[in-house]
Amino acid sequence: GNITDQVGDRLKHRTSQILSEITGGRYQEVLMDEALHMSVNTGERIVSIERLSRGTLEQIYFALRMAAGELFCGKDTFPVILDDVFGMYDEDRLTAVLKWLCKEERQVIISTCHKREMELLDKAEIPYRKIFL
């Protein structure tokens, strides 16, 4: 295939991997048709993104952004800056993403007005440094 197809396939594959990891395997694959309509494969059925909760949509967008960053930066590690992006996440979703970010061993800056992120980092025993501005 052409370069666009190759990049698209790699992006879809990595997005699917990340989404599967942060959802505990609940969503195994991100699918996209020619009209760029997205759906996910649960392993049992295909679900259109219109039928997913806002929290799950946010997980898909997170996985897509992380996959795009990896694709464009190649083997170079890149810092991740997240500015109040977890508002629609419940505690389980947020804990899964925080653990995934820790596992990736890259610099992560989380800007938030909530204490929940710190509480969940503490609960999961993920080391961090807090800075109050």
Predicted regions and their residues:
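Long, charged, glycine-rich C-terminal linkers/tails
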Residues: 24-43, 48, 78-81
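ABC transporter NBD signature
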Residues: 19, 53-55, 73
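Conserved ABC ATPase signature
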Residues: 2-10, 38-65, 85-91
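Conserved ATPase-coupling elements of RecA-like P-loop NTPase cores
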Residues: 73, 88-95
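Short basic/glycine-enriched coil/helix segment immediately N-terminal to the Walker B
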Residues: 70-79
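C-terminal lobe/lid and adjacent interdomain/linker elements of RecA-like ASCE P-loop ATPase modules
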Residues: 92-133
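A short, noncatalytic alpha-helical element within ATPase nucleotide-binding/catalytic domains
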Residues: 16, 61, 95-99
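Charged, surface-exposed helical/loop "interaction arms" that form contiguous linear patches used
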Residues: 1-23
